[in-house]
Every structure is written in C-alpha cells, then in structure tokens.
C-alpha cells in the first residue's frame, strides 16, 4: 500500500500551496478543530479535491490493469514500479511505454507462420532448391572408412516350428477363399522359411484333409505352382515322407486320410513334382497299415491314368466350376438313389459335397417333378420328408426353396401335357408342405389351379338344365 500511495503522489503531484483546499489541512489533522472555509453548493468537499480523487482513482485502475496483464512476463510493477515512478521514466507496461512495443497485445500471434528461413515455417528451403548428395569428408576427424559404399539390407530371421505354423495357417486358409497361387508365392518369398520349406506341403495337405473336395483340388494346384519357385522336388518328397509317417495321427481326425493322401501322391506324380519311382521306393519297407493303404490307393489311380483317364480328375471340379448339365445329372442321380435307399442323411451329405448352395433350387424342382410323375404314394411321402429335413437343417435356404416352387408354378402347364393330373397332385403336395412348415402362406397361395370344366348339360350348381322344348 505504501508503494501504491507513493506512485499516486508521484504520478499526480499536488501543489503544496493548495493543500488547504483538501478535505483536511495539516492543522486539522493535528488538532481536528479548524473549520473548512471553502464550501461549494452546500458540500463540505472542494471541487479541486473531487477532481484530484478522480484522477487518482483513474491512475490506480490503469496501473492495476497493466500490472495484471504483464504479471506473467516478470516485469510487474510490484518489482520495479517504484523505481520507475521515482525516476519519472515511463515504465514499459504503461500505455506510453507500449506504443513502440511490437509484441502481441493479447499474448497470441496473428496466426501467421513464423519465418524460419527461406520459405517460412514448415518449408524445406526455397522453392526449387535441389539438395546435393552429401559427400564424406576424408579430412574430417570423425571420418570412418566403413561409412563409404554401405549397402543396407533387411534381414528376416528364419521361422521356427511354432511361428511357422502360426504364420502359414492364415495364408493357406485365405488361399482357399481367393485361389490365387501367385499371391501365396509372393507371401512365402517374403518369409525366411529356411529348413521349413518341406513343411509347406505338409501343412497345406493337413488343412485340405479337413476341408472340401474343392480345397483339395486347390491344394494340388498350389503344390504344383510352388514347386520350382519356392521349393524344390526334394522338399516335396520330404513333405510326403512326413505325411506318410504322420498318417496314424491324421487318421484320428480324418478317417479317410489314407485314401486322401494316396490321391495327393497320385496327383503329385501326375503333375511331375514327384518322381515316378517314389511309390516303388516304399515297396516292402512299409510297416504302417495306413501308409500302405495310401500307397496302394496311389498305385491304383496311377494305373488307371495309364489307361487313358486324366490325372486331373482325381478330385474332380467342385463348386461353381462344374457345368450346369453335370450338376443336373448329379442331383437327378442323388434323388433316384434316395428313392431306392431311403437314406436321408446320405442324400444330405451328397448335396453338401456338390458345394453349390446357389443351385439347390434345382433339387427342389426335380423333387417336385418326380412327385408329379410318380404313380404311388411312396415318392410323395419320401420327397416331402426329404424337403422337410433339408429345410430344418438349413441346408436349403428360403430363397432357394421359393425359387424351386416358382419354377414349378411357371412350368406346370407344360408338365400337365405329359401328366394329366399334375394340377391336383401339385395342389395336394403344396398344401402338405405348407402344413409341414416348409413354405409360407404367400407361396402356397401362388400355386396355380385349373377349375373343373362343366359339361354342357350342367347348369349352375351342377344341376341339369330343364328342357326348353
């Protein structure tokens, strides 16, 4: 407070001669008995005193404002304000001292980039500037001969057995989805397989044994394309040796593993990635029953191929790669075999083996056609049970079921030419399917029906017309 009062007196000095005009003179302060002579408008405070009080209050506000603004910069008035006021020099924090100050008034810039050299902030030199290759100075005290002509190369550590299986399993599973052997070859080149190259066919065949026929066909193509680029024929032979050795364990998860491995061996010999004498080298030296069964299967297939059968047909073409005519024949044979054996689970298994879920409407269509063409009740009942089983197991979806019925509805006029009672049989079969929950009410109502023709002698209601003559 003493500093502030001292600043107020120095900034706004008052005349000592006019002290008598203030609120209290020196005598009144000591004695307190002398009256004030100057009275204006009935007030006991002089006009000059009021003006001085206003000036002092304004100076205080200005000083307090400047002090709070510059408190963060270490140049507050509390530190050096008293010396500046005594010396009569305007402090930098005062308005007069800040006129030539180029710093921001608000403590922030205008948002413009700083000039960090040519080009401004965040710019690497002037536009068009070309950087030369840094040359090593031989006379530099820190010069090292090893710094010249250095070639850097990424070193990939070889995979161990655990990392090998964890890395290659997703690659092969993705290959079963896209079927691009070149992509698999590029990914394997980026890995340092080392001595684990022979493990690639072992892992691929092991995964294919648990998959479908199309997966096994894709695995055979993959082995044929990788041989010579990623692995050699010796690696392929080592891999099949390990497969024959591990057959007892593989047969626990896949009972058909010996026959399937034999087919892989026959296909590999046919593709030229295994030598023709590979099977002969095992004659008389195999004690394992599963390995002997695999070699016998391969021998039979190779002997059949010599008679003219292509080795490419070991697995067949599965999935959507099969022609439509072939699929129609397979479904027709499937239904006829089911009518003879009555084995519903085998029919469902054969349908899944075709791997054509987008073509299941053909089975619905062919099944209903067989019902319309049959003369007994056995086909009617068996086909109804088959469709009901396939529907409950979600083997045939609602879209495929609907499409099969719609095909029958559209072709029933042509079918009726060969089967006169097809309309009545179809109405009965559709009603039974609706009662079993196979089709919806909307699909049932779409079933076409042909009304019975009235004879000329029949009137309305089936009565005979009276004679008009």
From Swiss-Prot:
Residues 7-23 have a biased composition (Polar residues). Belongs to the PDCD4 family. Keywords: Acetylation, Apoptosis, Cytoplasm, Nucleus, Phosphoprotein, Repeat, RNA-binding, Tumor suppressor, Ubl conjugation. InterPro entries: ARM-type_fold, Initiation_fac_eIF4g_MI, PDCD4. Residues 1-30, 58-128 are annotated as: Disordered. It is found in: Nucleus; Cytoplasm. This is Programmed cell death protein 4. A motif (Phosphodegron) lies at residues 70-76. Residues 163-284, 326-449 form the MI domain. Binds EIF4A1 via both MI domains. The keyword Nucleus applies. Residues 114-125 have a biased composition (Gly residues). The modification Phosphoserine is found at residues 25, 67-68, 71, 76, 78, 94, 313, 317, 457. The gene is Pdcd4. Polyubiquitinated, leading to its proteasomal degradation. Rapidly degraded in response to mitogens. Phosphorylation of the phosphodegron promotes interaction with BTRC and proteasomal degradation. Phosphorylated at Ser-67 by RPS6KB1 in response to mitogens; phosphorylation promotes proteasomal degradation of PDCD4.
């Amino acid at each position: 407070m003493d500093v502030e009062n001292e600043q107020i007196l120095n900034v706004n000095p008052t005349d000592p001669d006019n002290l008598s005009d203030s609120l209290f003179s020196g005598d009144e302060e000591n004695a307190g008995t002398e009256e004030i002579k100057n009275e204006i408008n009935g007030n006991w405070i002089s006009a000059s005193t009021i003006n001085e009080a206003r000036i002092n209050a304004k100076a205080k506000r200005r000083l307090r404002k400047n002090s709070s603004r510059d408190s963060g910069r270490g140049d507050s008035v509390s530190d050096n304000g008293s010396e500046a006021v005594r010396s009569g020099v305007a402090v930098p924090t005062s308005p007069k001292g800040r006129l030539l100050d180029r710093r921001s008034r608000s403590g922030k810039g205008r948002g413009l980039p700083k000039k960090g050299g040519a080009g401004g902030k965040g710019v690497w030199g002037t536009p068009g500037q070309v950087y030369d290759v840094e040359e090593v100075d031989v006379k530099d005290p820190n010069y090292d001969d090893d710094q010249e002509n250095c070639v850097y190369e990424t070193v990939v550590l070889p995979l161990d057995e655990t990392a090998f299986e964890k890395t290659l399993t997703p690659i092969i599973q993705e290959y079963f989805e896209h079927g691009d052997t070149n992509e698999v070859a590029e990914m394997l080149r980026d890995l340092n397989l080392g001595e684990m190259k022979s493990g690639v066919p072992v892992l691929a065949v092991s995964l294919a044994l648990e998959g479908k026929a199309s997966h096994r066909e894709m695995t055979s193509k993959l082995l044929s394309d990788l041989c010579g680029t990623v692995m050699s024929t010796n690696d392929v032979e080592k891999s099949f040796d390990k497969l024959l050795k591990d057959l007892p364990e593989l047969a626990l998860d896949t009972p058909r593993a010996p026959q399937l491995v034999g087919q892989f061996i026959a296909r590999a010999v046919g593709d030229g990635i295994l030598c023709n004498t590979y099977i002969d080298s095992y004659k008389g030296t195999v004690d394992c029953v599963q390995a002997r069964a695999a070699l016998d299967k391969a021998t039979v297939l190779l002997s059949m191929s010599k008679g003219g059968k292509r080795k490419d047909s070991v697995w067949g073409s599965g999935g959507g790669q099969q022609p439509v005519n072939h699929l129609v024949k397979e479904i027709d044979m499937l239904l006829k075999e089911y009518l003879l054996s009555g084995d519903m689970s085998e029919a469902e298994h054969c349908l899944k083996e075709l791997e054509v879920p987008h073509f299941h409407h053909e089975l619905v269509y062919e099944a209903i056609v067989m019902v319309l063409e049959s003369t007994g009740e056995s086909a009617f009942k068996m086909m109804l049970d088959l469709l009901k089983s396939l529907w409950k197991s979600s083997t045939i979806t609602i879209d495929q079921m609907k499409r099969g019925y719609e095909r029958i509805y559209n072709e029933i006029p042509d079918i009726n030419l060969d089967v006169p009672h097809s309309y009545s049989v179809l109405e009965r079969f559709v009603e039974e399917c609706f009662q079993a929950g196979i089709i919806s009410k909307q699909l049932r109502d779409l079933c076409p029906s042909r009304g019975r023709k009235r004879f000329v002698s029949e009137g309305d209601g089936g009565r005979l017309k009276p004679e008009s003559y």
